[in-house]
């Protein structure tokens, strides 16, 4: 598991899962390709806003924006990929009188991002918007089983509207 953007280890106190600090990709290893650190205000990494629907709030308060890819060089086999997202730019709450409204790309109030995600050049999430699916400042995770051949697993991101981003990533080998 990777604590995207962070320079620190993070341990989930319930599962004892240790999240590794982020790093740029180097051949024979793993890491991000492209993108930059999200800063809500100058000099501060991430946001201090509460992120809902997760017990690991610090993991979701940072993100890599405009990310191109995340690559892992690893042995061939079957893996589970889990991506974690929280749109920290999108509007976080709907007002009471507007609860029935549905966020759409055409809505003038929509401030979220929409992007495509592929794994090893196979489309996975098309026109994906965490803000439309769950709202702003809320965690959403997406899982996929992948058969790796050729020694690498690459998750690619392509912007449709706004920017691509990633808050966290887990890769587990399935035995």
Task: Label each PLM-derived region with a short phrase.
Residues 1-175:
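Compositionally biased, intrinsically disordered or flexible polar/acidic segments
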């Amino acid at each position: 598991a990777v604590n995207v953007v962070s320079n620190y280890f993070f341990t989930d106190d319930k599962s004892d899962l240790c999240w590794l600090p982020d790093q740029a990709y180097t051949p024979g290893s793993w890491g991000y390709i492209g993108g930059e650190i999200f800063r809500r205000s100058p000099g501060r990494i991430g946001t201090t806003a509460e992120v809902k629907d997760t017990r690991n709030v610090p993991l979701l308060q940072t993100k890599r924006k405009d990310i191109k890819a995340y690559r892992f060089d690893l042995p061939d086999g079957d893996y589970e990929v889990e991506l974690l997202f929280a749109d920290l730019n999108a509007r976080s709450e709907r007002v009471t009188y507007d609860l029935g409204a549905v966020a759409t790309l055409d809505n003038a109030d929509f401030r979220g991002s929409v992007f495509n995600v592929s794994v090893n050049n196979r489309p996975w999430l098309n026109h994906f918007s965490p803000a439309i699916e769950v709202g702003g400042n809320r965690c959403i995770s997406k899982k996929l089983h992948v058969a790796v051949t050729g020694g690498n697993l690459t998750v690619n991101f392509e912007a449709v509207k706004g920017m691509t981003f990633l808050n966290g990533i887990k890769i587990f080998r399935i035995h």
